[in-house]
C-alpha cells in the first residue's frame, strides 16, 4: 500500500512538470520606465488579461479634458496592447469599467462604442472613488487568441 501511495505521489508530481501552459508577460516601455509593479497584459494559453488602464499620455500624465479624452487614450493604449498579441477590439470578450462619477456613464459609452462594435464584449461596471492617478475611469479587459484550426 505504501508503494502504491509513493508511486501515485510521484506520478502526480511529474504531471506538474509536464504542464505546457503558455504564460507571456507584456509591459510597455512606459510601464517599465515608471517601474510599476505589474504587467500591462499577461497571456495564459489563449487568454489575454489586460491590466486596468487609465488615460495617461506617453509621459505618464493624465490627459486633460476629463473622461472623453481619457477614454480615447485608453482605447488607443488597448489597441497597442492587443496588437502585441496580433489581436484587435473584436477579440475582446469581457471588460470591467471602474468609473469615478457614474453620471459620466453616457460620456464613457459614447467613446466605447466608437471602438467596440456589436456584438459587444460582456461588461461589468461600478462606481469607484479615488482611482489611480485621479483618473475619471479605469478599464480592464480580457481577450482571446483564436485557435488556428
At which residue positions do the language-model features occur?
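Sec-dependent N-terminal signal peptides
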Residues: 4-13
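N-terminal presequence-like segments and the immediate start of the first folded domain
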Residues: 16-76, 80-90, 99-149
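Surface-exposed aromatic
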Residues: 93-95
Amino acid at each position: 500500500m505504501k508503494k502504491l501511495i509513493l508511486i501515485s505521489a510521484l506520478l502526480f508530481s511529474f504531471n506538474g512538470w509536464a504542464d505546457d501552459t503558455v504564460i507571456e508577460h507584456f509591459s510597455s516601455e512606459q510601464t517599465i520606465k515608471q517601474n510599476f509593479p505589474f504587467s500591462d497584459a499577461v497571456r495564459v494559453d489563449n487568454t489575454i488579461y489586460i491590466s486596468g488602464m487609465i488615460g495617461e499620455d506617453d509621459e505618464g500624465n493624465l490627459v486633460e479634458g476629463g473622461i472623453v479624452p481619457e477614454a480615447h487614450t485608453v482605447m488607443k493604449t488597448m489597441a497597442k496592447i492587443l496588437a502585441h498579441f496580433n489581436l484587435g477590439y473584436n477579440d475582446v470578450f469581457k471588460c470591467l469599467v471602474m468609473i469615478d462619477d457614474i453620471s459620466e456613464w453616457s460620456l464613457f459609452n459614447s467613446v466605447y462604442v466608437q471602438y467596440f462594435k456589436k456584438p459587444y464584449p460582456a461588461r461589468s461596471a461600478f462606481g469607484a472613488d479615488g482611482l489611480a492617478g485621479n483618473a475619471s475611469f479605469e478599464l480592464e479587459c480580457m481577450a482571446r487568441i483564436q485557435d488556428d484550426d
